[in-house]
A protein has these predicted regions:
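Structural/interface elements that position substrates and couple domains in central-metabolism enzymes
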Residues: 1-341
């Protein structure tokens, strides 16, 4: 393991780049980390060296070629020394069977022989199927489609969580009934969508659609719905507390998804802020996966969910296994009135 490009790249035949692709304050794609990594790799290649560069970061179609080509123009390296390929990162932290060694991969490059070689490489890493596609751009687009579709699917069930209770219907019962149909895609509603992929990648899709004169409808709508869930959920907690802001509330879970310690883009933070804006008093947060969370000053991170008297409501924000396995009879003793959201 090294952070020294200069000592490692010259001896390599292949470089895999997997860095974050965030958005800026205006929700526009920020390729800074990708460009910086590519420049560092290209800049470390010997004058007579050759290298295949595989990008794994989520990007728009055309980005791999564009960023590498631009880097080569400003370097001592000729175009003939570098081959380009793309294989999007796929992993689902916290879920068994979806690790790097399990999931299928998609490989596209500028050369059929290189595509075959890289496919064989990834097939040694994963037990999943490795799909070779016709171009870098097809592979890039596939990753955007995966995550944009998931955001849309989750937005629909979140919308159902808003609608169905108004009809006097239980959301879980309706979804479970619908799931008896063989081609129904089952998702669960929540207080929002978090992580470094699903809330971010759709903006890359929206941007490239708009840049090509396509009026994207579903992805922007999905982003609006999913981004609204922390506010909606906070208002539902107030409603559950007889229309009064809770004086004391216990939130279980802070990370963006169950069984991980990653709190990037967690919807729990805007949910907490919405509670505070709605006049909530003391807020306690318990998450067995996170030692220190970047919480507002008025929020207390606790190491034990039990023994806190006078709690108005318990919120299951992130359903860790440890949360599900809590002694709910004991936890109930902390509540003034049995209220669990």
């Amino acid at each position: 393991v090294t952070t020294d490009y200069g000592s490692s790249i010259p001896s390599c035949d292949l470089a895999i780049i997997c860095v974050p692709t965030p958005v800026d304050a205006e929700l526009q794609p920020d390729l800074g980390p990708v460009k910086s990594a590519i420049d560092s790799v290209v800049g470390s290649l010997k004058i007579d060296g050759n290298l295949a560069i595989i990008l794994e970061s989520t990007v728009q179609p055309g980005t791999t070629r564009k960023c590498i080509s631009e880097s080569l123009v400003n370097s001592h390296v000729s175009r003939e020394q570098v081959l380009m390929a793309y294989c999007p990162e796929r992993v689902s932290p916290g879920e068994g069977g979806y690790g790097v060694q399990d999931v299928g991969r998609v490989v596209g490059s500028e050369d059929p022989i290189l595509t075959e070689v890289i496919s064989q490489l990834y097939q040694q890493i994963t037990s999943g199927n490795v799909r070779a596609v016709s171009s870098i751009e097809v592979a890039e687009a596939s990753k955007l489609v995966e995550n944009a579709q998931r955001d849309i699917d989750i937005a629909f069930v979140n919308e159902l969580a808003v609608l169905l209770p108004k009809l006097g219907l239980d959301v879980e019962e309706v979804l479970s009934a619908a799931a008896t149909k063989w081609n129904f895609h089952r998702h669960k509603p929540g207080i929002g969508v978090g992580g470094h992929c699903i809330p971010i990648d759709p903006h890359y899709y929206i941007d490239i659609a708009q840049s090509n004169g396509v009026d994207s409808v579903m992805s922007p709508a999905a982003r609006v719905r999913n981004s609204s869930m922390p506010s909606f959920s906070a208002k539902e907690v107030v409603r559950l507390c007889d229309g009064k802001a809770p004086e004391k509330i216990l939130i279980l879970g802070y990370s963006y998804k169950p069984n991980v310690s990653d709190s990037r883009e967690t919807p729990v933070l805007p949910f907490i802020n919405e509670l505070l804006d709605n006049g909530a008093g003391e807020i306690l947060v318990w998450d067995p996966f996170i030692d220190t969370a970047n919480l507002p000053n008025s929020v207390n991170q606790i190491s034990n969910p039990y023994g806190h008297e006078g709690v108005d409501c318990v919120v299951i924000a992130t359903a860790h296994d440890e949360v599900k396995d809590l002694d709910w009879s004991n936890l109930k003793k902390t509540l003034k009135v049995p209220r669990i959201f």
